[in-house]
C-alpha cells in the first residue's frame, strides 16, 4: 500500500498567472499566481487562468482531505460539473489527480437533485470503496424548496459518514436563493458536510458564460481550482481519473456544453512522485 503523504509536497495544478487569495483566518499566504492551501504541513501552488484575481471564501466545515483515510472521490452534478469532465476539457481531473485523488465524475446535463440519489443507488451500492463525495446539484430547480432540501438531505444521508462537499449555485435568478439557503441548512445539520460557496466565486468577472449559469472556458479552470482547494491533498498519492457511468448530455440546450473531445481520456494515474 502506498504510504500516506507526509512532509512538504509541491504540486502545480494549473498553468497561468492569475492572482489568488484564500479567505479564512486572514493569515494565509497570498502571492501572484500562488495560493496557500492549509490542512497539511506542505506547500501547494495553485494558479488561476491569466487575468483572474479571486479571493476564495473559507470552506465551512473544513477541508475534506484531512478527514478521510482513502482517496476515492465521487463527484455528482449537472452540466456545470460535466463540462469539466474527461469527455470535454478534463479540467477537474487535471486539478485533482495530482493531489492524489481517484476521481469519478458522475454528471449529466439538465439533471435535478434526484439525479444524485439515482447515481448513489448505482455506484454506492455496487462499490463500497468511496471515501468522500462532492455534490453540485441545484442549478436545475423546480421551485419547491422543501422537495429540493429533501433530496439533498437524502444524498447526504446515503453518503454518511463519508465527508461530503456541497457546492452552492450561482445567483443567476432569484429562486436560487432558496436553493442555496437549503444547502446551507443541510450542511449545518451534518458534521460530515463541508460547504464550497460557489455563489461568491462565480461573481468574479469572466467565470461564467453570458447566460450567467454555465462556465466560461477559463471559468472551468477556476471551478476546478476552487474544488481542489476545498478538497486539499488526498491521503495517498496514487491519483487517477476514473471511468464515468453517467455520461448523457443530450438534454443540454444548444451551445451549452463545450466541444467534446474526439476520444475520451482514458483513466489515468498520477505521476506525482
Region annotations inferred by a language model:
Residues 160-164:
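A short helix->loop->beta-strand "cap" motif at the edges of active sites that frequently abuts
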Amino acid at each position: 500500500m502506498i504510504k500516506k503523504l507526509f512532509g512538504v509536497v509541491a504540486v502545480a495544478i494549473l498553468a497561468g498567472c492569475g492572482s489568488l487569495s484564500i479567505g479564512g483566518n486572514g493569515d494565509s499566504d497570498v502571492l501572484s499566481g500562488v495560493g496557500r492551501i492549509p490542512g497539511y504541513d506542505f506547500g501547494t501552488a495553485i494558479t488561476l487562468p491569466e487575468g483572474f484575481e479571486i479571493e476564495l471564501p473559507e470552506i465551512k466545515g473544513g477541508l475534506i482531505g484531512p478527514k478521510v483515510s482513502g482517496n476515492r472521490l465521487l463527484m455528482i452534478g449537472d452540466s456545470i460539473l460535466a463540462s469539466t469532465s474527461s469527455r470535454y476539457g478534463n479540467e477537474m481531473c487535471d486539478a485533482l489527480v495530482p493531489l492524489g485523488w481517484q476521481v469519478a465524475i458522475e454528471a449529466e446535463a439538465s439533471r435535478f437533485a434526484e439525479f444524485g440519489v439515482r447515481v448513489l443507488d448505482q455506484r454506492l451500492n455496487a462499490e463500497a470503496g468511496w471515501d468522500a463525495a462532492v455534490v453540485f446539484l441545484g442549478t436545475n430547480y423546480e421551485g419547491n424548496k422543501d422537495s429540493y432540501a429533501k433530496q439533498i438531505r437524502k444524498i447526504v444521508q446515503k453518503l454518511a459518514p463519508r465527508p461530503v462537499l456541497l457546492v452552492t449555485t450561482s445567483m443567476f435568478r432569484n429562486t436560487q436563493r432558496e436553493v442555496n439557503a437549503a444547502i446551507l441548512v443541510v450542511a449545518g445539520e451534518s458534521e460530515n458536510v463541508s460547504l464550497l460557496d460557489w455563489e461568491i466565486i462565480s461573481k468574479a468577472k469572466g467565470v461564467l458564460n453570458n447566460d450567467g449559469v454555465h462556465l466560461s472556458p477559463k471559468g472551468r479552470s477556476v471551478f476546478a481550482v476552487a474544488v481542489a482547494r476545498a478538497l486539499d491533498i488526498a491521503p495517498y498519492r496514487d491519483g487517477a481519473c476514473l471511468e464515468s457511468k453517467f455520461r448523457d448530455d443530450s438534454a443540454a440546450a444548444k451551445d451549452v456544453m463545450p466541444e467534446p473531445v474526439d476520444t475520451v481520456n482514458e483513466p489515468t494515474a498520477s505521476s506525482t512522485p
